[in-house]
């Protein structure tokens, strides 16, 4: 099971292959204001572009993803 870690202080999101901070990072994003929980069963990572507009950059299924929010 993969793990998504969203840090609200540093505004980062990291997706780990397995256990957070003990396994390989699959992908990491900066300038992440929020991670949305979508009605269709996905976590959606939103990132700010140069115009400060939020764009979806990653969708992962809730069914096989643990998510942790750090501050």
Give names to the regions the model predicted.
Residues 1-11, 18-19, 24:
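Anionic N-terminal interaction surfaces
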């Amino acid at each position: 099971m993969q793990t998504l870690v969203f840090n609200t202080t540093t505004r980062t999101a990291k997706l780990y292959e397995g256990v957070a901070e003990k396994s390989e990072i699959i992908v990491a994003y900066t300038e992440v204001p929020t991670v949305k929980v979508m009605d269709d069963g996905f976590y959606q990572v939103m990132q700010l572009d140069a115009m400060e507009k939020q764009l979806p950059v990653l969708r992962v299924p809730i069914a096989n993803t643990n998510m942790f929010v750090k501050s």
